[in-house]
């Protein structure tokens, strides 16, 4: 029987993902969801085949350049990877991956939420309700403006703008 790859997951990931990791690999999860210390990450580099950090985990040259390291791949959870010293990973022949499109639709949804919140004064209304300042309905109070029939201007047409344009159609 082939031995499963040992992986260290540095933070809490979605349950379905963690379940899949546990069945596919010899996975160690961070059930406390606390940031691992530099010393713990260095030890992880020595003890695991793969390190699965998030964008909030600084994976520095000191961590990557650990002597007697076992890690061959760093699979970052998130679109960005500026938390990882890429030059150090290259020098140490460690593959670095990320999830570039994982947040495209989510970010487009948030952009739509912000547009609706501003146009319809949603955030302002929510603030009044939470602070028990809501005095009841009045015909023109907090009316805002409709987004229907408006023109949406998008600067650049990257992944997020394209997704937003599909929501807005």
Located regions from the model:
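An N-terminal-biased, well-structured beta-alpha scaffold segment characteristic
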Residues: 2-97
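Phosphate-binding beta-alpha-beta segment of Rossmann-like dinucleotide-binding domains, i.e.
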Residues: 100-151
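Short donor-sugar binding/catalytic loops of nucleotide-sugar-dependent glycosyltransferases
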Residues: 80, 102, 157-158
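Electropositive phosphate-/nucleotide-binding environments in soluble metabolic enzymes
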Residues: 15, 35, 105, 109, ...
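Short, structured secondary-structure boundary patches
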Residues: 50-54, 77, 114-122, 158-159
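Rossmann-fold NAD(P)-dependent oxidoreductase module
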Residues: 20, 110, 114, 163-167
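Rossmann-like dinucleotide/phosphate-binding beta-alpha-beta segment
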Residues: 140-168
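Short glycine-/small-residue-rich flexible loop motifs, especially phosphate/cofactor-binding loops
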Residues: 19, 86, 126, 137, ...
């Amino acid at each position: 029987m082939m031995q499963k790859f040992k992986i260290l997951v540095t933070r809490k990931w979605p349950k379905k993902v963690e379940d899949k990791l546990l069945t596919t690999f010899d996975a160690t999860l961070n059930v406390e969801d606390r940031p691992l210390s530099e010393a713990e990450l260095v030890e992880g580099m020595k003890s695991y085949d793969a390190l699965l950090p998030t964008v909030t985990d600084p994976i520095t040259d000191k961590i990557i350049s650990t002597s007697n390291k076992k890690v061959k791949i760093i699979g970052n959870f998130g679109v960005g990877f500026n938390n990882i010293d890429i030059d150090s990973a290259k020098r140490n022949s460690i593959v670095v991956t990320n999830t570039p499109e994982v947040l495209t639709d989510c970010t487009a949804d948030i952009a739509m939420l912000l547009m609706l919140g501003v146009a319809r004064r949603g955030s302002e209304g929510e603030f009044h309700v939470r602070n028990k300042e809501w005095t009841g309905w009045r015909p023109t109070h907090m009316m805002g403006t409709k987004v229907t029939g408006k023109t949406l201007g998008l600067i650049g047409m990257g992944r997020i703008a394209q997704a937003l344009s599909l929501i807005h159609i």
